[in-house]
Amino acid sequence: MAADPSAVAARAQDAALVRACSFVHVQDRLPLCWPTPSGTPPSPKRAYRSHYVYLGCNDLQDRQSWQHLSDFDLVLRLIDFSGLRPVLAQRLGWTSGRGWKPFDPVSLFLLLGWQISSVWNRAQTLKNLDDPRYADYRQRFGFRQGVYPTEGGLRYFLTSLGHHSDSTGDAVRIELDNEPAVQVVIQYLNQLLVGAAQLIREAGLFSPEAWAQALVCPDGMLHDAASRLRCAAVKDSCYQPTSTQAPRPCPAKEKEQQGCDCDTLACADTCRYATPRDAEARFIHYSGSNQPRHSPNRAKDESKAKQGSGRKCYGYRSLPLLLADPVRRFHVTLLLDFQTANGREDVPAAALLWQLKPFYPDLHLDTVVGDAGFGFDVFLRTIYQLQARRVVDLRAHETDKDKSQWPLRGYDDRGRPLCPFGYAFTANGFDAQRQRYKWFCGKACQRGIEPVARLKGTTYPPAECAYQDAALPHGKILNVGERFLDGSRRLVRDVPVGSPAWKALYHRARNASEGRNATYEYWDLKRLSVYGLCRAKAFSFLADTWSTLTTLARLVREATFANTS
């Protein structure tokens, strides 16, 4: 059997991709113009201290010049960002042309993209902006020599973007079982991700299947805060003033730890062990495993797994919704949410799925893949309501360990239906129109197949089975839709767990998640360099936007230099 080619090699052999997306064929459509959402008002500012103008891509005619251009350099030449100006102005909360003369928000967007992709800190970026070696970048960003933003100006830019991302209060209502409904605020910085994804489509880089049969996967990522951990038990109350009349409660003492008495002047406004610059940061010990249940590296007994394993994080969690292109083997971030590290993932992930339709009206959702952390009812129900297939790893429960209960409830610990005598059903395909999976017993009891679970006091093979009649050639037929007959949906999946189809879908999604993880590792964004939830949120949205944009440039480069002979 021939080895599976790498993603780069596979794309180089994709004649349709090379024919449509190499520079020779795409140059007549350049520049790709940033799409401005309909209804977005123009920027109220009429003058700026800098001014971005698209400067063309004439140097790309020389193929030798490509060797010296990074993916970021190609982005500056392939895309006209003028349409982004009103979007950023709205996200910055600008409503009037009065007041100070700001820098062009597109200039700052490009400057921060330069910082992120070059893995520089803020001070180094501003220093390089004034360096004569980088005069061409300064010109393409739209800055005048000697007129640059300060570090404080960049901090203010990020703070404003993060604050106004959800300042409208628009929210998605998520219904929970046996709990009050939750309102998940919509992050309008997602307009940046939508614009970048639309540029990928305009360039013709997506395969037709990627959009018509969308495979999406949420995958939370922990980020250490810029502030260093002082107390793992810190809560909102630690940032409230204290007095002798109303002493501040100590969450650490509630956990029978030493804690802080908060009886000194240093603790008057805020506990001295808190982190005021990252007041929303929280501590979590992540002991879960991203390994699927069928992975050979997963521990057989989770209780015997190495003690103390896992990751400790004091900070935040980004939650992207990734679109994986299974044909051309790359991914983009469709939507993103950002929260504290200890926040639950299933509810905001469900909200992101509901937001796909308003942000991407023509995207056809086919399959949603996720690890066991998303295997809760609210997320599984949302996928079903959106008429997509559930390929979410199984979330274990104590009841799964008792095999004697499997025939009574009607399914095993992997969601495979069982007959009342403990024989496993055989999968017979997914009915997308009726949104249910069909199973049949195939008269396993008459074919010498061992039952998965034996019942005490029952003779095998059982003679009293009502489906052994010759008039029923397939035996008992069972259709499983949203739930099993006992009302549970925890183990209901629309692709048999562990089957080749399951593994193919799951691996595609995991590759997308690992690809984003590798990008964040390379850009050194696992520990945030900015303080506070607003700045951290804005920086994460910018990073995912630039990840998509540099992916566009990288794929155009590959198509341009592909040898399809």
Question: Which stretches of residues belong to each language-model region?
Answer:
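Dynamic "connector" segments at or just before major functional cores
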Residues: 2-117, 134-140, 144-149, 156-201, ...
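Short, hydrophobic/amphipathic alpha-helical patches that form generic packing surfaces
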Residues: 107-119, 540-551
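Short, charged amphipathic recognition helices of the HTH superfamily
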Residues: 118-138, 514
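Polybasic low-complexity intrinsically disordered regions
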Residues: 127-130, 156-367, 372-385
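Short amphipathic alpha-helical "interface-anchor" segments enriched in bulky aromatics
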Residues: 129, 404-441, 488-531
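Low-complexity, serine/threonine/proline-enriched polar segments
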Residues: 160-164, 242-291, 406-480
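An internal, acidic/charged active-site-proximal segment
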Residues: 343-452
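Basic, amphipathic alpha-helical segments enriched in Lys/Arg and hydrophobic/aromatic residues
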Residues: 503-565
